[in-house]
Amino acid sequence: MKAYKTKVGTGEFPSRCKEEDENVLAKFGNEFGATTGRPRKCGWLDFDEVNQAIKMNGVDHLCLIKTDVFTHIDEPKVYYKKNLIGMPSINDVSIDDKSFSSLLLLIKGLTDVNRISFTTGPKRGEIVWCD
């Protein structure tokens, strides 16, 4: 799953970012429509939706992609139980980075999923497997 959420079209989007963060996510996450080239609506990862998908599909491992985009956001957030949860800025997408490690621990805590992997960039081999 992406480290943030995107949406096209109308309808509710309770985790939508402020415009400044939305522009950063669209730019560094390459979130533009294939046909129109318009930027997609961007928001914070919605753990209410994530937990519903985990429950419905029996997920026991999550792979977080586009985490490198968070290094461009001053105050990243996640959305849980209709509230935004702020996190410290992430300097490096690495388990050695305290802020990034706290994000991984937060995800484990909010989802009850014990295994997480994440990507550090857009290339095929840029994945880190965690236990």
Predicted regions and their residues:
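Non-transmembrane, aqueous-exposed alpha-helical and coiled segments at domain scale
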Residues: M1-D131
